[in-house]
Amino acid sequence: MFKKKAKEEKPSPVPDAQQNGELPNSGPIIYYIYESEEEEEEEEEEPPPEPPRPVNDKPHKFKDHYLKKPKFCDVCARMIVLNNKFGLRCKNCKTNIHHHCQSYVEFQKCFGKIPPGFRRAYSSPLYSNQQNACVKELMPFSASNRTDPVFDTLRVGVIMANKERKKGQDDKKNPMLEEEPEELPPKPEEKQEGDVPDGDKKGEKGGQDAKNKKAQPGFMQSHYFVALYRFKALEKDDLDFQAGERITVIDDSNEEWWRGKVGEKAGYFPANFIIRVRAAERVYKVTRSFVGNREIGQITLKKDQIVVQKGDEVNGYIKVSTGRKVGLFPLDFLQEI
């Protein structure tokens, strides 16, 4: 009759949430500390500034060129024979080089085109129309045979203007030889006396000749002259000579045209075609073309040019002069004449 009621389970009280989301009786409070790590930027050292690269404002314009005739490289002075005689030639200055030598002339300035009126041979720079002409000794050879009519006209005009001057100089006696006729008149008086023996007469003549030679104004024997270029006579009274010949100067009163003698031949020639050589100096002929570096005092010369030694050998180079410029040149490319 009597039934037992099931015990009602009392709902357990939910604990109140505390601040900061902490549960009661959950143990000691744990605090978390977050440290912000600041990345320290390492100061990178700036690299040293690069040196300014030299800029060539007048570079060569090289193009592949087939060399029909044997040519020497203007850098290494060796013949261009590889790759079926193909090389590089500058469009402006006509410089010939190997393909593997192009890096050596990267910073060398181009001389530019040669005026067509001055395409003349290095052996006769004023009046020759041959190939391989040069305006200046620093300029490379040209590969053209063309001439300028203006240049030819000026050349003829110079020749005509010099004719009267040469004739006038021929009429006048050479001042170097004027002393001899002044001393000749006393000879008849000596013959009239008849008291001087033959031996004494010969002695007096020899003494007079020695005096004339000593008193004769002119060039000293401490030096002589050598032809730099080949000069072809244009007139009958011109002196024809080859490059490297020794010339005896007779008259140098004119600045442009001198009178000289080679062997038994005598005549006029341009004064800038010869160079004075001292007794202790040597004369050389260039056997190979060479492009020198001006920054270290080297000189650029072409084959068959005539130069004069001006210094001793240093590390295979000697100081030479062409009359217009002086510089260092390899001794192996020179032949003494």
UniProtKB/Swiss-Prot annotation:
Q: Where is the composition biased (Acidic residues)?
A: 35-48
Q: Where is the composition biased (Basic and acidic residues)?
A: 1-11, 167-176, 184-212
Q: Where does the sequence pass through the membrane?
A: none
User: By its UniProt entry, which PROSITE patterns does this protein fall under?
Assistant: SH3, ZF_DAG_PE_1, ZF_DAG_PE_2
Q: Which GO terms describe its molecular function?
A: zinc ion binding
Give the source's domain of life in one word.
Eukaryota
Annotated Phorbol-ester/DAG-type zinc fingers sit at: 59-110
Per UniProt, which keywords does this protein have?
Answer: Cell membrane, Cytoplasm, Membrane, Metal-binding, Repeat, SH3 domain, Zinc, Zinc-finger
Which BP terms from GO are recorded? neuromuscular synaptic transmission; positive regulation of protein localization to plasma membrane; positive regulation of voltage-gated calcium channel activity; skeletal muscle contraction
Q: Topology with regard to the membrane?
A: Peripheral membrane protein
Compartments reported by the entry: Cytoplasm; Cell membrane, Sarcolemma; Cell membrane, Sarcolemma, T-tubule
Give every SH3 domain span. 220-279, 280-337
**Matches recorded under InterPro entries:** C1-like_sf, PE/DAG-bd, SH3-like_dom_sf, SH3_domain, STAC1/2/3
- Sequence segments annotated as region (Disordered): 1-61, 162-215
CC per GO annotation:
cytoplasmic side of plasma membrane; cytosol; synapse; T-tubule; voltage-gated calcium channel complex
Report the main location listed first in the record: cytoplasm
Q: What does this protein do?
A: Required for normal excitation-contraction coupling in skeletal muscle and for normal muscle contraction in response to membrane depolarization. Required for normal Ca(2+) release from the sarcplasmic reticulum, which ultimately leads to muscle contraction. Probably functions via its effects on muscle calcium channels. Increases CACNA1S channel activity, in addition to its role in enhancing the expression of CACNA1S at the cell membrane. Has a redundant role in promoting the expression of the calcium channel CACNA1S at the cell membrane.
Q: How does it assemble?
A: Component of a calcium channel complex with CACNA1S.
Q: What protein is this chain from?
A: SH3 and cysteine-rich domain-containing protein 3
